């Protein structure tokens, strides 16, 4: 966000960049140390640093970049886990500001959905004229790709965040087979049945007590042979990698987010 990699495109000292950008020199010095250790920066002679190979750099503005994941981890995951001791002592929880972090979370979801896209596309093959609903469509990158690939099908996306919904509208404005609506899931009233409903990275916003009600509700929105596709992280057991436990702990740290489902629960 500070375009620091651009500031280090030529060999330059930390103090010079700190002065030019009017930022804290001590923190910038620590930032450069991390950059060197992970290969984003090169340490040059006379205490100068230079940006490393461009392909290695996180690029937050590109949906295919790891930069969006790093941004979410720095803004949300790491601070939440570091706050665990205080929360346990005070018996409190953080509050997830959905509007503040909506854009970051939407970008991360869009990056991860690239992995699921081929599987979803298989559900649409063989029947080009389908009606598809994407719940929590984010910035619309997902249904944009599907709409371009299946022009005879109609795609509707609903998104609770007003700013994210507007981004989705802009991204899909050129596609006649896509419509975006700013709406809460529980307030949405479909006008017709859907052949395919997509629900990606939404489960943790729904309390465990209301998940069965949600699935019952969605089943009424499906056509006779309709399909509900759910993409979500799942909570692991004691034998799962440490990252899985840490990831699930993140959701437990917020009063308005909920634990990930177990595979058996799904």
Regions found by a protein language model. Name each.
Residues 241-262:
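Conserved Class I S-adenosyl-L-methionine
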Residues 168-169:
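Conserved SAM-binding loop
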Residues 128-138:
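Conserved class I S-adenosyl-L-methionine
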Residues 212-224:
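A short glycine-rich, Lys/Arg-flanked "PGG" loop and its adjoining helix->strand segment in the class I
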Residues 1-77:
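N-terminal accessory segments
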Residues 161:
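Conserved SAM/SAH-binding beta-strand->alpha-helix loop
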Residues 225-233:
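Conserved beta-strand signature within the Rossmann-like core of class I S-adenosyl-L-methionine
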Residues 139-151:
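Conserved SAM-binding loop of SAM-dependent methyltransferases across substrates and taxa
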């Amino acid at each position: 966000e500070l375009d620091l990699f651009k500031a280090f495109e030529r060999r330059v000292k930390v103090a010079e960049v700190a002065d030019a950008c009017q930022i804290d020199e001590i923190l910038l010095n620590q930032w450069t140390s991390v950059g060197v250790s992970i290969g984003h920066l090169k340490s040059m002679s006379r205490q100068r640093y230079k940006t490393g190979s461009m392909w290695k750099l996180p690029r937050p503005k590109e949906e295919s970049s790891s930069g969006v994941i790093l941004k979410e981890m720095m803004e949300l995951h790491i601070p939440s886990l570091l706050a665990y001791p205080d929360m346990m002592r005070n018996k409190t929880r953080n509050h997830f500001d959905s509007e503040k972090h909506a854009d970051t979370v939407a970008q991360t979801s869009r990056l991860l959905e690239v992995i699921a896209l081929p599987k979803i596309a298989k559900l649409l093959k063989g029947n080009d004229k389908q009606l598809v609903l994407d719940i929590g469509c984010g910035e619309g990158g997902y249904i944009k790709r599907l709409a371009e690939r299946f022009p005879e099908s109609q795609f509707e996306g609903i998104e609770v965040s007003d700013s994210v919904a507007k981004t989705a509208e802009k991204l899909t404005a050129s596609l006649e087979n896509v419509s975006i609506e700013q709406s809460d899931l529980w307030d949405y009233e479909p006008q017709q049945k859907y052949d395919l409903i997509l629900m990606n990275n939404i489960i943790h916003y729904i309390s465990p007590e209301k998940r069965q009600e949600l699935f019952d509700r969605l089943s009424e929105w499906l056509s006779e042979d309709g399909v509900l596709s759910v993409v979500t992280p799942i909570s692991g057991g004691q034998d799962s990698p440490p990252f899985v436990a840490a990831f699930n702990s993140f959701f437990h740290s917020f009063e308005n987010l909920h634990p990930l489902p177990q595979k058996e629960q799904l």
